[in-house]
């Protein structure tokens, strides 16, 4: 992503600017209640687009979480693009989580796909098949393939994903975001050594989801 060292993600600048401008105008007009309301809105937008630095674990076989959130699904599932049974881990991001997404493993982007769809609540498993989504297929230097999918939700209707096919990505690198709450699905080889359980909280770029064989 372009906003590597800024405290606020660049994608949030327009929202912060608009909310801040409205706040200033209302304050100058002495509309105190509305000015106070939009000040709160401005602070929330800044909070939502915060861009914290993360320390990624050193183990190259470790798969790190692509998102801040909570594990809401863990189990075998068929991944349609690789057409095989894989270990699926779904992470739910609320509006209060950091929404910048990070690369789970170092490797090359061998495929990228976009599927238009609905905007169901992402905690509903139907969202896997019916919601708008954007996915990357990554291949590590050892030839291991995995898939990470950004799923749009009831409120989050804007997926941002920068990598293109052929790009080389580093584990923990920022690669996109989903605006205002959603879900990330990670598909790993079935023989991955899991390090998370249902209900666990995750930190993007830091929490180890599993160890590749």
UniProtKB/Swiss-Prot annotation:
Q: Enumerate the Gene Ontology biological process terms.
A: phosphatidylethanolamine biosynthetic process
Q: Where Pyruvic acid (Ser) occurs along the chain?
A: 182
> How is the co-factor bound, per the entry?
Binds 1 pyruvoyl group covalently per subunit.
Q: Name one GO molecular function term.
A: phosphatidylserine decarboxylase activity
**Key word Lyase present:** yes
User: Superkingdom of this entry's organism?
Assistant: Bacteria
**Taking the first listed entry, what is the main subcellular location of this protein, grouped into a coarse class?**
membrane
Positions of the record's site feature: Cleavage (non-hydrolytic): 181-182
Q: Which GO terms describe its cellular component?
A: plasma membrane
Which cysteines pair up through disulfides? They are none
Q: How is it modified after translation?
A: Is synthesized initially as an inactive proenzyme. Formation of the active enzyme involves a self-maturation process in which the active site pyruvoyl group is generated from an internal serine residue via an autocatalytic post-translational modification. Two non-identical subunits are generated from the proenzyme in this reaction, and the pyruvate is formed at the N-terminus of the alpha chain, which is derived from the carboxyl end of the proenzyme.
Q: Which residues form the active site?
A: 182 (schiff-base intermediate with substrate)
- Annotated signal peptide: none
Question: Assembly and interactions?
Answer: Heterodimer of a large membrane-associated beta subunit and a small pyruvoyl-containing alpha subunit.
Task of the protein? Catalyzes the formation of phosphatidylethanolamine (PtdEtn) from phosphatidylserine (PtdSer).
Instruction: Show the NCBIfam families listed in the entry.
Output: PRK05305.1-2, PRK05305.2-5
Q: What is this protein called?
A: Phosphatidylserine decarboxylase proenzyme
């Amino acid at each position: 992503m372009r906003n590597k060292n800024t405290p606020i993600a660049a994608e949030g600048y327009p929202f912060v600017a608009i909310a801040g401008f409205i706040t200033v105008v209302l304050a100058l007009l002495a509309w105190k209640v509305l000015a106070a309301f939009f000040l709160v809105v401005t602070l929330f937008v800044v909070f939502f687009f915060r861009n914290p630095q993360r320390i990624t674990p050193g183990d190259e076989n470790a798969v790190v979480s692509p998102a801040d959130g909570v594990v809401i699904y863990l189990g075998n599932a068929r991944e349609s693009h690789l057409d095989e049974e894989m270990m699926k881990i779904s992470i739910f991001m609320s509006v209060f989580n950091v929404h910048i997404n990070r690369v789970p493993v170092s490797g090359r982007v061998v495929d990228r796909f976009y599927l238009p769809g609905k905007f169901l609540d992402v905690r509903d498993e139907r969202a896997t098949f019916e919601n708008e989504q954007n996915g990357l297929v990554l291949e590590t230097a050892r030839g291991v393939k995995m898939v990470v999918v950004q799923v749009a939700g009831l409120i989050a209707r804007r997926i941002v994903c920068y990598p293109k096919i052929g790009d080389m990505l580093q584990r923990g690198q920022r690669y996109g975001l989903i605006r205002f709450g959603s879900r990330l699905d990670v598909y790993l080889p079935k023989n991955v050594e899991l390090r998370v359980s249902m209900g666990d909280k995750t930190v993007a770029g830091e929490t180890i989801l599993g160890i590749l064989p």
